[in-house]
Amino acid sequence: MEAITKQYLELFAEHSLELRERPQLLGHYREGAYDTFARLGLPRFKSEDYQRTDLAKLFAGDWKLLLSEGSPYWASHAFPQGIFIGSLSDFVRLYPEVAKEHYGRIASVETDALVALNTLFAADGFVVYVPRGAKMPGHIELRSILPSRAGHISVERALIIVEDDAEATLYFEDCPEGTGRAMALRTLEVYVGRRARFALIDREESSAERIRITSTYVRQMKQSAVNLSALTLANGTTRNNFFITLAEEEA
C-alpha cells in the first residue's frame, strides 16, 4: 500500500466515530468505499486518464478534513409540485426510498478511487429532487456546496434526481470566499428520467491556491436530454470528470 493511500485511510480512522453519526444511508456505502480506495489508491500520474494531473502531488501534505452539517448557502425547502431542495440528511428522512434508489448507485464507487474517497468522507450532501412531471420554474442557483477553509479538504456531495417528464436547471456558482490553499473534492450524481430535461451550468471563479476535483456521473433514461456546461474563469488547479451513461435508447 502506498504511503499516501495509508495517509487517507488513517485520516478516515481519525474521523470514523464522527462520521458514524451521520445518516445510515451514507454509512452503508463507506465499507465498500474503504475497500475500493485501499485497493486502488489514487490514480497514477501519466496513467491513461491522468496524463496531466498529478493527484498524489495535490493530495500530499498535512491536509485536514472539513466536516460540516451543511453549507450556510442552503437549507432544506419543499416547493410546489413536490420539488425538494436541501440537505441529503433531510432528504433521506423525508424520501427514504427515493434516496436509497439513487444515492451511491450512479457514481462508480467500485471502480473510481476519487468517488470512493468522496464516499468514504461524505458527511452530508446537497439534493435537488424534481418528481415525475414537475417543471422547475426558472433555475436553481447554488453559491457553494461547502465553504472553503485554508489547509482543509471539503468533501462535497450532490444528488440530483429529475424524474420522468420533469424539467430542471441547476446553476452552481463556485466562488469560495476563503483564502489560502484549500481543496474541494466533489462527486455529483445525476439521474434524468424518461423524457426529462436537465441542464447544469457549473461556474468556477476561485484563487490560484485552490484545488477543485469534480466527478460528475449522469444516468439518462429513454428520450431524456441533458446539457452540461463547466466554465472556469479563474482558478488554481481544476479537474472536471464527466461520465455519462445512456441507459436506454434515444437518450
Predicted features along the sequence, with ranges:
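Conserved beta-strand/loop scaffold segments within soluble protein domains that form the structured core
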Residues: 94-251
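N-terminal amphipathic, basic helical "cap/leader" segment at the start of enzyme domains
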Residues: 1-119
